[in-house]
């Protein structure tokens, strides 16, 4: 995994060299995940081309930007583009219900009060990550006050503090 925020051309070339060596030495294939590829400069993206063209790596890149504008044409033409669409309200609701019940989630420590699910779903706007983050914040506030029932007010309060973070980094 390479983060476009932290990696330079040198780091990209090191990963590619390591992947090429692993492929030649043992046949081991490397999948390189590049988060926020839109933050890669043209030279960083150019550094990937030989590895992609020669199949030394399989690359998976994630971006919140339009790749037609943020990814260089030669790299884009050698990529399979998958567009992810916002989830519908039903899918967000199901995700939140699973998180409430799951042992790896909130483990039934809290319940949603009347109207809370609708508010969570509306604020999430099709983004499951945002919905889960908001649920977690509302659950923490509810438990902090010694209750188990997440109210609409809990969700609104959690959203008000979380919106500041979401606005700053758009996540």
For every predicted segment, state its role:
Residues 12, 35, 48, 63, ...:
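Conserved RecA-like P-loop NTPase ATPase core
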Residues 2-30:
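Short glycine-rich substrate-engagement loop in P-loop NTPases that contacts/grips substrate
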Residues 3-6, 80-93:
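Conserved AAA+ ATPase "SRH/arginine-finger" region at the nucleotide-binding site
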Residues 150-171:
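C-terminal engagement/docking regions of AAA+ P-loop ATPases
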Residues 16-24, 34, 38-77:
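Conserved catalytic/switch belt of AAA+ P-loop NTPases
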Residues 118-123, 129-144, 154:
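C-terminal helical "lid" of AAA+/P-loop NTPase domains
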Residues 96-117:
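Helix-loop-helix "sensor" segment of P-loop NTPases
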Residues 11-18, 47, 51, 74-78, ...:
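Alpha-helical scaffold elements adjacent to nucleotide-binding pockets in ATP/GTP-utilizing enzyme cores
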């Amino acid at each position: 995994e390479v983060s476009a925020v932290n990696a330079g051309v040198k780091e990209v070339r090191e990963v590619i060299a390591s992947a090429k060596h692993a492929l030649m030495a043992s046949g081991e294939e490397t999948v390189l995940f590049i988060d926020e590829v839109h933050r890669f400069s043209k030279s960083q993206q150019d550094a990937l081309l030989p590895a992609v063209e020669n199949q030394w790596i399989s690359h998976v890149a994630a971006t919140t930007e339009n790749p037609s504008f943020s990814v260089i044409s030669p790299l884009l033409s050698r990529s399979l583009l998958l567009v992810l669409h916002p989830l519908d309200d039903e899918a967000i609701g199901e995700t939140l219900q699973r998180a409430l019940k799951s042992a790896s989630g909130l483990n039934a420590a809290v319940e949603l009060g009347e109207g809370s699910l609708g508010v969570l779903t509306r604020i999430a706007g099709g983004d499951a990550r945002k919905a889960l983050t908001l649920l977690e914040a509302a659950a923490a506030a509810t438990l902090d006050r010694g209750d188990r029932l997440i109210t609409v007010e809990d969700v609104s309060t959690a959203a008000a503090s979380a919106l500041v973070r979401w606005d700053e980094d758009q996540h």
